[in-house]
Each structure stands twice: as C-alpha cells, then as structure tokens.
Amino acid sequence: MSDVEWSVLPGLSPYQETLSAMEARVAAIRAGDAPEAVWLLEHPPLYTAGTSARPEDLVEPDRFPVHVAGRGGQYTYHGPGQRVAYVMLDLDRRGRDVRRFVCALEDWVIATLAEFNVKGERRAGRVGVWVVRPDRAPGPDGQPREDKIAAIGVKLRRWVSFHGLSINLEPDLSHFEGIVPCGIREHGVTSLVDLGLPVTMQDLDAALLRTFSRSFPD
C-alpha cells in the first residue's frame, strides 16, 4: 500500500463544501504539504454537470439541486446509497497520461466489482463501467441490455487529479430519471443491490481498499 491517505466521511457530504475542501487538498498536494488522498463519501441527492453537459440532458431541472462540477463528462447523479470516491493523486509523479489514469480508475472499479463476482466491463466511447443484463429484455437492436453501474469524471490541476468515480450500491435508481446519465439514452443504470447482491457500504469500502494498489502501484 502506498502513502495515500484514506478517509471515510460520515453522513451525507454537502457538495460545494466538499468540492472546496477537495480543491484545497489538491493545492496542498501540489505544494508538497499533504499526501495523496482518497475520500469515500455519500452526497445528498443532486445532479452534477461536467464540462460536456448538454442542456437537453437535464430532463427535470427542478427535481434536485444542480451543481456545475468542472470535471470531465456530462450529467450524473449522486445520492445516498452511492459510494463516491474522490481520488487526489499526483500524476506528475505517477505519469502524465490522462487516458491511462482514467483507464486505471476503470480497472479499479472492475477489480472491486469482481470481489463480489460481478463482471464489470468497458465499452468503447462510453466512459464508466457497465454490466450485461441477460436477465432483462434485449434492447431495440436485439443486443443484450447493458446497464451502467459506475461513473467516472475527473479534473486535473497542475497534474494533481480530483473528482473521481461513483459506484451504485443501493441508490434510488429512479433518481437517475431526471437526467440522461452521461448523455447516453439507450442504456440504463443498475446497482449492486439491484443485481441481487446483499452488499453493505462497509463491504464495498473494504473491496475498494483491497484492490486499489493493483491499479495504482506506488
């Protein structure tokens, strides 16, 4: 395990306060005043807009607060029952390759899901992690349905990463209906509990910790 500092934040973390704290931590990491960090938390129900968000993808603008996140990507939902991992790593030291970093985040999610015998997969042109749903009716094209279980969106400031990923453990999946998640209309969303797995947040956190160093060796 590297010297990354891990924190599990209790309760529901207010979005703007958390973003400000994250930006301060990124500056401290860049200045050499603080170690790299991973924060595990939950937010109250809200939508965030990434730098590629399209107005038409905010279907219900009055349903929950909407925050401009400044990260890459489009609209996503955060709320109770979803584990958010904010990942603040020094890519100046680990390698200045944004694409590789995003792939490493996907690898981390895939390895974490495998701890629960869930096969997470990448899809070209669709950042995030997906699961095939043979238990559901095929899509309009006759192909097996695929649902998104994890979203990824990052930003770099002087080669220190922030924002990160979210994994759906047991959120209210109907809350995603207020947006077009990540701008993708033809696929749905799922969660570990929706897949029939009695996983707790503590189980998920332990799996994230166990698998982290495989994707982010020191």
Curated annotation (Swiss-Prot):
Recorded metabolic or biological pathway in which this protein acts:
Protein modification; protein lipoylation via endogenous pathway; protein N(6)-(lipoyl)lysine from octanoyl-[acyl-carrier-protein]: step 1/2
Against CDD domains, the record matches this protein to: LipB
Q: Which SUPFAM superfamilies match?
A: Class II aaRS and biotin synthetases
Q: What are the recorded GO MF terms, alphabetically? A: lipoyl(octanoyl) transferase activity
Concerning Pfam families, the annotation shows: LplA-B_cat (PF21948)
Q: Where in the cell is it found?
A: Cytoplasm
Q: Which InterPro entries match?
A: aa-tRNA-synth_II/BPL/LPL (IPR045864), BPL_LPL_catalytic (IPR004143), Octanoyltransferase (IPR000544), Octanoyltransferase_CS (IPR020605)
Task: Return the EC number.
Answer: 2.3.1.181
User: Which residues carry the site feature described as Lowers pKa of active site Cys?
Assistant: 148
Cellular component GO terms, alphabetical: cytoplasm
Where is it mainly found?
cytoplasm
Does the UniProt entry include the keyword Cytoplasm?
Answer: yes
Question: EC top class, in one word?
Answer: transferase
Every copy of the BPL/LPL catalytic domain together lies at: 32-218
Keywords of this entry? Acyltransferase, Cytoplasm, Transferase
Q: According to its UniProt record, which reaction does this protein catalyse?
A: octanoyl-[ACP] + L-lysyl-[protein] = N(6)-octanoyl-L-lysyl-[protein] + holo-[ACP] + H(+)
Binding-site positions, substrate = 71-78, 151-153, 164-166
**From its record, what is one biological process in GO terms?**
protein modification process
Another remark in the UniProt entry says: In the reaction, the free carboxyl group of octanoic acid is attached via an amide linkage to the epsilon-amino group of a specific lysine residue of lipoyl domains of lipoate-dependent enzymes.
Q: What does this protein do?
A: Catalyzes the transfer of endogenously produced octanoic acid from octanoyl-acyl-carrier-protein onto the lipoyl domains of lipoate-dependent enzymes. Lipoyl-ACP can also act as a substrate although octanoyl-ACP is likely to be the physiological substrate.
- Read off the NCBIfam families from this record: lipB, PRK14341.1, PRK14345.1
In Swiss-Prot or TrEMBL terms, this protein is called: Octanoyltransferase
| Lineage of producing organism | Bacteria, Pseudomonadati, Pseudomonadota, Alphaproteobacteria, Rhodobacterales
Q: Which gene encodes it?
A: lipB
